[in-house]
Amino acid sequence: MVRAKRTKRASVTDIYRGCKAAGTCPPDVINKVEHTTIADKILQYGSAGVFFGGLGISTGRGTGGATGYVPLGEGPGVRVGGTPTIVRPGVIPEIIGPTDLIPLDTVRPIDPTAPSIVTGTDSTVDLLPGEIESIAEIHPVPVDNAVVDTPVVTEGRRGSSAILEVADPSPPMRTRVARTQYHNPAFQIISESTPMSGESSLADHIIVFEGSGGQLVGGPRESYTASSENIELQEFPSRYSFEIDEGTPPRTSTPVQRAVQSLSSLRRALYNRRLTEQVAVTDPLFLSRPSRLVQFQFDNPAFEDEVTQIFERDLSTVEEPPDRQFLDVQRLSRPLYTETPQGYVRVSRLGRRATIRTRSGAQVGAQVHFYRDLSTINTEEPIEMQLLGEHSGDSTIVQGPVESSIVDVNIDEPDGLEVGRQETPSVEDVDFNSEDLLLDEGVEDFSGSQLVVGTRRSTNTLTVPRFETPRDTSFYIQDIQGYTVSYPESRQTTDIIFPHPDTPTVVIHINDTSGDYYLHPSLQRKKRKRKYL
């Protein structure tokens, strides 16, 4: 079966051309071609009051106005994340040279008095081109708006040199230097030098010098001192001579107004005198193990319960609680922490007593507010800390070889230096020829000495003072080129090897069904080797 060919339908314009003359055009075709549809009429009436310019919003062509449509994401502007487009002016084509032009002179009028005979002359045409003027335009690269200082050129008369005035690239700016010093109260440098005139022992030193180093010309020094004015110096108070009274810091990170706290439902439930019984507890178990105050039971010390506790008991039996204040307590809430008007921390628990039980099984009892106020933590007296090896007074330098002690010894009384001896021997009992008088009874202490081994006599000696420190180890280096005796300390212990019996590690099983055990081949008795005759 062959499919019939589809005939192309006539357009609206072709139908309008054929039916307009006969007057048989449909209304929709006439409105479409003559632009009399409802949409066209709305635009016609609206354009009388509103002008949209050349936007092209009509039934005309969709050209987008004079500039045309701009696709989304494109345009002459700067794209997001891209390089800005630099707009450069168009380049004018350069003219290499003028074209060959033949100059033509204008026709001059003939003078009537001139002769009628015209002398012929050879006239040549100048076909050579004139001076060629070359014009080349260089378009500068567009730059940012920057201020450029242009030098000023001053020209004088003929024969004089030009003066070039170069201005500064930027005018000098006024600068101001400020210094601020902050003192750290947690760090204080303590000086050990002897305080001089006008110097304090703290970190803030004030040094006052008198002008005594110069020379006075033209008069005695007394006249200068008499005419000068003496300024009485006042002592500035140290920054540690006063105390800063700071306000009381807040007790909580987010303080709550007392009016809002007093209106809370929890506070009304705890401190309602008409509905809640107030009981002050003095037993410390109320803070950690309140269940031990209600009934005798075993508590797990590793478990801290901060939830509501319910105690079940048989009302037919009378049980005495460990604490009389917790009699008939059936329910005890979790701990609540509040603040008293005196500023103490109060631990509260809201409980309910099961005093009466009805026939229906309902238990009736009053609410009880158990509370305990925590005591004040007394502030311990501060302990004055002593600095180790430092002090703020005068420093004392002790030089042993320089200092000497003079001891007045009487020859007649050689034993007078002995401490605790009251009697003085007579001259007859003293042997002046004895060598015991020359003995030095001083005890030498070599606990802090150092042994130096060397043969050079030109070795420089560096004396290092020794200070008392809490550490026991001290390292003294006398000279880099000298000899140093080091005694290394070894703490390696010798491993003790315990003897073990020589038992083979390989066990050989023997298929022996005669017994329920087996012997190692090394434990079996060796058989004697017999010679056969």
From Swiss-Prot:
Protein name: Minor capsid protein L2
Keywords: Capsid protein, Cytoplasmic inwards viral transport, Disulfide bond, DNA-binding, Host endosome, Host Golgi apparatus, Host nucleus, Host-virus interaction, Late protein, Microtubular inwards viral transport, Phosphoprotein, Viral penetration into host nucleus, Virion, Virus entry into host cell
Modification after translation (UniProt): Highly phosphorylated.
Gene Ontology molecular function: DNA binding; structural molecule activity
GO CC list: host cell; host cell endosome; host cell Golgi apparatus; host cell nucleus; viral capsid
Motif Nuclear localization signal, residue numbers: 1-10, 525-532
UniProt feature coiled coil, ranges: none
GO terms, biological process: microtubule-dependent intracellular transport of viral material towards nucleus; symbiont entry into host cell; viral penetration into host nucleus
Main location: virion
Its biological purpose: Minor protein of the capsid that localizes along the inner surface of the virion, within the central cavities beneath the L1 pentamers. Plays a role in capsid stabilization through interaction with the major capsid protein L1. Once the virion enters the host cell, L2 escorts the genomic DNA into the nucleus by promoting escape from the endosomal compartments and traffic through the host Golgi network.
Record text on subunit structure and interactions: Interacts with major capsid protein L1. Interacts with E2; this interaction inhibits E2 transcriptional activity but not the DNA replication function E2. Interacts with host GADD45GIP1. Interacts with host HSPA8; this interaction is required for L2 nuclear translocation. Interacts with host importins KPNB2 and KPNB3. Forms a complex with importin alpha2-beta1 heterodimers via interaction with the importin alpha2 adapter. Interacts with host DYNLT1; this interaction is essential for virus intracellular transport during entry.
Similarity field: Belongs to the papillomaviridae L2 protein family.
Species assigned in the record: Human papillomavirus 9
Protein origin, superkingdom: Viruses
Subcellular location: Virion; Host nucleus; Host early endosome; Host Golgi apparatus
Gene name as annotated: L2
Disulphide linkage map: C19-C25
